[in-house]
């Protein structure tokens, strides 16, 4: 569980660490990195500007690329138990007719499972052994390794020096400006959607999507229930979820009991979470004053179901590489991490952007053409670039060793032989 901890106590705990690490943002990427570093004996300071953890949560589908992070944390069994495999994926026409069903388990069986899990359950798994965090605190300036902590209202809180400062504060990151990343390359689709939860009526291993004319409906299994996403152009959502859900029902011939219950769940929720369908990426993750991680570095559209998984992978890669880092080699290890991981994340993000071009288009002719393509295009073909990433995960230990050896070869520190 997340444990509210005074900032002074976190700072005191890391006083003798070989690397003093600050993580700004207690989302999935920030928590994953903090917990992995703690498992390795460090005491990273973790802060979040929110006064309490109040994120309402949504559903996630995680590729097998995340599994090693849970193994390293000693919670892989808990992770498996908290989710449910999404074994099959079904695609429906804009009128609701089933067009095709593909096996996800056959697609990924060599590597693992495509696991459906709620965000809340995922955070419970990641923090199962306790996770100190200071809420109501963020950073508004960094200079020569010293971070200035402030309250959400801007009131000063403290200052402290660190060897590594990491911005993991989400897709609308403020740490981008603090660390000098500049404006991100962003895709603003003009679409949003509501997230709700529904009972699973009969098929807990099936994910379904209906790409309609001016709307999108998806249902995704998590443990004991379905995560529902119902979205459309922002202007069409102006009258609220119940009205939009009603308009969707009027445009579809065949929903069936499962999708009908999903639409009803959105309409009945008094305050469903609204998810804006935008993305963002920065050209560099390693910056003069720190590092960006997760959505702060590359925030995804949810069209390929890979964003959270890549955030976890990036955090795991960084944590494993920091095992072999000290202050003398830190800069080279960070550069090596970015060289290895950023192209993978950007390839996955580009795949999400490609699918978005299919999804976020209106008109019956467009819907018909899209369905013609999707009827012939298997999930294997649609997610081809992502499957390549699953099959070719880099070795962080080898990359870190190479970076460390290169540092010592270029400029051996006193008392160190470059050939040892």
What residue ranges belong to the model's regions?
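Conserved mid-domain beta->alpha element of the FAD-binding
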Residues: 23-39, 43-50, 166-167, 194, ...
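C-terminal helical "tail/cap" subdomain of flavin- and related membrane-associated enzymes
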Residues: 1-19, 96, 304-305, 320-420
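Flavin-dependent oxidoreductases
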Residues: 189-220
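Conserved N-terminal helical subregion
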Residues: 2-21, 36-38, 63-179, 184-197, ...
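Conserved N-terminal glycine-rich FAD pyrophosphate-binding loop of Rossmann-like flavoproteins
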Residues: 52-68
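FAD/FMN-dependent oxidoreductases across multiple families
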Residues: 213, 223, 232-304, 310
């Amino acid at each position: 569980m997340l444990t509210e901890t005074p900032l002074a106590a976190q700072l005191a705990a890391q006083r003798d660490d070989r690397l003093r690490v600050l993580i700004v943002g207690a989302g999935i990427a920030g928590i994953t990195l903090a917990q992995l570093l703690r498992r390795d004996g460090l005491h990273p300071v973790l802060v979040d500007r929110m006064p309490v953890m109040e994120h309402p949560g949504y559903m996630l589908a995680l590729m097998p690329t995340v599994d090693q992070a849970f193994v390293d944390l000693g919670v892989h069994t808990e992770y498996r138990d908290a989710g449910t495999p999404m074994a099959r994926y079904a695609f429906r026409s804009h009128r609701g007719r089933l067009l095709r069903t593909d096996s996800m388990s056959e697609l990924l069986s060599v590597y693992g499972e495509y696991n459906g899990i709620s965000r809340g359950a995922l955070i419970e798994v990641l923090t199962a052994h306790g996770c100190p965090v200071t809420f109501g605190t963020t950073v508004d300036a960094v200079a020569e390794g010293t971070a200035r902590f402030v309250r959400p209202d801007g009131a000063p809180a403290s200052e402290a020096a660190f060897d590594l400062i990491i911005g993991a504060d989400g897709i609308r990151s403020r740490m981008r400006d603090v660390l000098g990343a500049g404006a991100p390359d962003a895709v603003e689709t003009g679409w949003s959607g509501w997230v709700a939860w529904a009972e699973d009526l009969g098929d807990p291993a099936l994910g379904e999507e209906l790409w309609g004319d001016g709307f999108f409906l998806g249902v995704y299994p998590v443990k004991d229930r379905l995560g529902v996403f119902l979205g459309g152009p922002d202007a069409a959502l102006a009258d609220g979820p119940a009205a939009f859900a009603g308009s969707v029902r009027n445009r579809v011939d065949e929903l069936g009991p499962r999708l009908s219950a999903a639409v009803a769940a959105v309409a009945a929720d008094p305050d469903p979470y609204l998810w804006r369908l935008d993305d963002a990426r920065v050209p560099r993750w390693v910056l003069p004053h720190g590092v960006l991680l997760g959505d702060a570095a590359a925030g995804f559209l949810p069209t390929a179901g890979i964003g959270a998984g890549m955030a976890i992978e990036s955090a795991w890669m960084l944590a494993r590489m920091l095992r072999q880092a000290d202050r003398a080699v830190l800069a080279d290890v960070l550069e090596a991490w970015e060289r290895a991981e950023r192209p993978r994340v950007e390839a996955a993000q580009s795949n999400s952007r490609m699918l978005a071009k299919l999804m976020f288009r209106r008109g019956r002719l467009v819907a018909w053409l899209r369905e013609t393509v999707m009827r012939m295009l298997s999930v294997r073909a649609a997610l081809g670039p992502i499957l390549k990433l699953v099959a070719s995960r880099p070795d962080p230990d080898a990359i870190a060793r190479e970076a460390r050896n290169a540092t010592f070869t270029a400029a051996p520190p006193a008392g160190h032989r470059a050939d040892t």
